[in-house]
Amino acid sequence: MSPNIRDICALFLPLNGVYPNCATFRLEVAGLAEGRPSVLVGDFILVKRRDASTEWYKGCVHEVSADTVNLRFSSNFSTYKGKKFDVRFVLNRLPLRRMHQALTLKTDATRFLFPELEHVRMGRVNTEQLSSITPINRLIGEDYEQLMTVAAIVHQPPGSVPFIIFGPSVHVYFYSVVSVIHDVNCRPGTGKTITVVEAIRQLLARDPKVSILACAPSNSAADLIAQRLRVLGPSQLFRLNAASREYKTLPEILRDFTLFNGNLVFATPSIERLKKYRVVVATCVSGGIPHGLGVRQGHFSHIFIDEAGQCMEPDAMISIKTMADKWTNIVLAGDSKQLGPSVRSHVASALGLNKSYLTRLMAREVYDLRTATGTTYLSIALLQTLRKF
């Protein structure tokens, strides 16, 4: 049985008066701190008395601590001290539902799902384009390769093929169609995320119409992007959090960039308010929230996905399929050589779900250095010093 779906025998401790018109109880759960089972705010837990009763009651989790969860039931649920219950932890299907929603959306997705040479709209960065970039981060200005990468992203025409930044955390590999791969030894602090942040700030500075959705597989990775963009201020930057996230896990310096209610539960702004932000940062799963609010496809001129090598392709598609139109540019940053997506199903893994979107794209001919020809510029900057592949 999945570690997230199991039955246990448990005792409830009543929490009288916490919520009016609700039966509120505290449930002790062994292994909660280790994520076995994984329980988040907003999850549902089913309980049934251990006697002859066959009726299951549904409780909603409204607080999670190291070894207990607080549950709210309807007012018709009651118990007394010492009464034993069977407890069933139910898998939270919201991420799966958002993946299915994204995959079933009808859209002209050939350009970013199965890009071909005919979809490429840009040649190599020229001297004029490169000189037009005034680095905001001095580390970028001191690194020619990183600067060239930023220039390439900034000057991509709308509707280009996905732009890929790839390599391990201490190196960035630059990819262009000259039958070579360029290995750049980066200075500390000039990795992929720094390059992504610089590109975002350059895009914002050059065009007031630019609107960006920046995603990452985990809250920690998304928080890192938001922290490095906080110079934009709360009027331009919004850190979009799922209601299931614990408030205490958000870095304090980002609290002015998000929205939460009086119970310290993260909330979602109105569509009008969300559309006013120039940069929205979220996890890949929460990247589907704007679509749920009614934000139209194409509202975001650019979609960035950092650590794209670690998320399943359906995760990446949540933001791309719901928010991209034929003019939206997509930028992926990640390392196809590192550990890929975590897939529990052996069947799904064998059928390819353990291969990230970034990895699959890089295997296509349009990104293949050995078969691509001519001067077509595909993914990242051409370096002055070439190293034979």
Predicted segments with their positions:
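Walker A/P-loop NTP-binding motif
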Residues: 154-155, 174-180, 193-207, 228-229, ...
